[in-house]
Design a protein with these regions (language model features):
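C-terminal accessory/binding modules appended to enzymatic or scaffolding proteins
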Residues: 112-146
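C-terminal structural cap/anchor segments
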Residues: 81-113
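Glycine- and charge-enriched loop/helix tracts that form the active or gating conduit
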Residues: 1-84, 122, 138-144, 148-151, ...
Length: 174
């Protein structure tokens, strides 16, 4: 785990002989605590080369936890903000890695499994601004959830002006 982390953080390549040795002893990773695996994997995900997290799967170091060793497209991890929730969410989505297999904090698990909750907090429009449109109580929360679902698919729309326009259009009906 650490060899891959050092490669991700420090920008070097792991020699073929070292990779072969890691592959041969990969089953020993089953003896590592979930906390240790989570810590090392998260450091890789937050590094300048987060795509190397896929090496842990390809080398068999996470075979006992799940996830696909065939995980192309991990360069997309670099496009995510270098923060735990977005990087974990993308890693799990791209590899099928089960976040529930590791002892992770409740907030991280919730952010990965329920991205809409984080999207509500990230809205560029406040509940007060929705209240100014005439919404009250639970209707504000419902509108925030609908707008959050929208920005998950269309992040470019997360501006106050665009969200206000969407909320107004929804209020005026079809």
């Amino acid at each position: 785990l650490r060899a891959v982390r050092f490669a991700a953080q420090l920008g070097f390549s792991i020699e073929k002989g070292t990779l072969d040795a890691i592959r041969r002893s990969a089953r020993r990773a089953e003896n590592l605590s979930g906390e240790r695996i989570k810590a090392e994997l998260e450091k890789i995900l937050l590094s300048p080369r987060p795509e190397l997290a896929g090496e842990l799967l390809r080398l068999g170091l996470l075979a006992h936890l799940g996830g696909s060793p065939d995980c192309p497209g991990l360069l997309a991890l670099r496009e995510e903000p270098p923060e735990p929730v977005p990087r974990w969410r993308a890693f799990c989505r791209l590899t099928g890695f089960p976040i529930a297999a590791l002892p992770v904090e409740w907030a991280l698990r919730r952010g990965v499994l329920h991205p809409e909750a984080e999207a509500v907090r990230a809205l560029a429009l406040s509940g007060g601004e929705l209240a100014a449109l005439g919404l009250e109580g639970p209707a504000i929360g419902a509108a925030q959830r609908r707008l959050a679902a929208h920005i998950l698919s269309h992040p470019e729309d997360n501006t106050p002006a665009r969200l206000l326009a969407l909320a107004r259009a929804e209020l005026s009906g079809p």
